[in-house]
Amino acid sequence: MSRPRKRWRDVDGVFLLDKPQGMSSNDIMQKVKRLFQANKAGHTGALDPLATGMLPICLGEATKFSQFLLDADKRYLVTAKLGERTDTSDAEGQVVETREVHVETPQILTALEQFRGDILQVPTMFSALKHNGKPLYEYARQGITVEREARPITIFELNFIEYHAPFLTLEVHCSKGTYIRTLVDDLGEVLGCGAHVTMLRRTAVADYPVAEMMPINELQLLAESFPLSELDRLLLPTDTAVSKLPALHLDVEQSKAIGFGQRVKFANEQQLSGQVRLFSAENLFLGVALIDGNIIRPQRLITQSA
């Protein structure tokens, strides 16, 4: 007798996954999607298979706002091994160079200074960035090196945690587009000994609370033991993906017009500009709009349930 087919459903919100080591971000996202039986899912910035930690999974209408989390600041805890460079700049790659380590803590503290603030970083060849429509890692696996332009990034904080040679642990608060593997590789070159990542854990995305993260095995157990309604209680509201934007509450007529995708005039007593979160008179999240003087221009709107 065949198993009953799983019924997929519309479910909206953000699930804070504590990603396990050894799985790709896409594979683990698909598993979360299946457990919630969600029609639609998307993650908010890939973590390497080696990495663990916070991976917000957007379900349903929340996928419309995943770009805001892709663009958000991130925090990481990283351990590097000095004295070895690998082709991927992490422990999953092949060692391509070995050097002796004659590095003391004061040298590390001095070297860290040049990586703080606004810097330029050349992305690793083992990345999903595309060249002529093809991911760089595909070229790298064929032994081909493609010239990459340095990209501007910001390292807001780069904190020394501990050093027990040859292992160095750092805490990083960085902008979007930062490759921690490249940061470690570049630091190793400044120190003159080379380095690669042996442990990487993302500890924060935007302002999401670490305490709300859940490992996939716990979610699996809940899915096997409780109805979907209990799983839905784990989801954070869709508007948390855009929580850094100022909020604008509309009246009934304004909400109706916005719902039809129309531009709306308003008094703009708060002197708002740029992007805002829109809420109805009943405090329902409507989506994101752009404020242009006293005009509200809808950009991404929630499809309201009938």
UniProtKB/Swiss-Prot annotation:
It is an enzyme of class 5 (isomerase). GO terms for biological process: mRNA pseudouridine synthesis; tRNA pseudouridine synthesis. One of its GO terms (molecular function) is RNA binding. It comes from the Bacteria. It catalyses: uridine(55) in tRNA = pseudouridine(55) in tRNA. The keyword tRNA processing applies. Its EC number is 5.4.99.25. Responsible for synthesis of pseudouridine from uracil-55 in the psi GC loop of transfer RNAs. HAMAP family: TruB_bact. Belongs to the pseudouridine synthase TruB family. Type 1 subfamily. This is tRNA pseudouridine synthase B. The gene is truB.
